């Protein structure tokens, strides 16, 4: 409860930001400022934000980054840039178990957002998964100088790459159809949480 009160006080001091960009963005801005000043990992920053301001702040950031990444480059970008796991940053090896995304899904389920649009978004969040190519080596047909056939074992250039991109594209399309409406719902949700005003 104390952390929730601290978040409310911090946000209500940002009247210019609220007027220009809204309550949700004001919540995100606190995290961004800390992240830039401390240059820690995304995971560490999210953990700091939760410890400092509570789960509402954590939910605001996780759902905000999800929306930004998916609307910018789809669910594949969300994964590739590391916002679904604990290793932010493009490239590298990201965790296909997407632990931060799993936290987002749990927080969403506890949020009380039950309207039709939010329920559709929650379903998309639950359906998001990553499948990687786990075949490290391939066998290729080869022939020796005398024409005898043999199989040669070669490296698979796609080893570790995401292979369910068509599935992810379907999730992208489903989200794009409702994301604008969902952002309006989220803004009202965070406004109510900060101010208590249901109008």
Model-derived segments and spans:
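Non-transmembrane, aqueous-exposed alpha-helical and coiled segments at domain scale
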Residues: 97, 101-112
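Acidic, metal/ion-handling microdomains and their immediate structural contexts
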Residues: 2-3, 130
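Extended, alpha-helix-rich binding/interface surfaces that flank or overlap catalytic cores
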Residues: 10-79, 85, 89-95, 115-199
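Long, low-complexity intrinsically disordered regions enriched in Ser/Thr, Asp/Glu, Pro/Gly
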Residues: 6-7
């Amino acid at each position: 409860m104390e952390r929730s009160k601290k978040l409310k006080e911090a946000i209500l001091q940002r009247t210019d930001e609220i007027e220009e960009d809204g309550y949700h963005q004001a919540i995100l801005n606190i995290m961004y400022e800390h992240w830039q000043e401390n240059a820690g990992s995304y995971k560490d920053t999210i953990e700091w934000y939760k410890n400092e301001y509570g789960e509402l702040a954590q939910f605001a950031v996780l759902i905000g980054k999800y929306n930004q990444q998916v609307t910018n480059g789809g669910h594949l970008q969300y994964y590739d840039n590391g916002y679904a796991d604990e290793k932010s940053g493009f490239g590298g090896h990201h965790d296909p178990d997407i632990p931060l995304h799993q936290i987002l899904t749990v927080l969403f389920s506890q949020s009380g957002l039950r309207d039709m649009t939010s329920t559709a978004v929650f379903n998309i969040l639950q359906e998001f998964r990553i499948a990687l190519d786990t075949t490290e080596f391939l066998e290729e047909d080869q022939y020796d100088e005398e024409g005898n056939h043999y199989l040669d074992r070669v490296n698979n250039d796609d080893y570790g790459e995401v292979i369910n991109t068509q599935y992810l594209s379907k999730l992208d399309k489903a989200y794009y159809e409702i994301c604008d409406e969902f952002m309006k719902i989220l803004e009202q949700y965070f406004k109510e949480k900060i101010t208590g005003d249901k109008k």
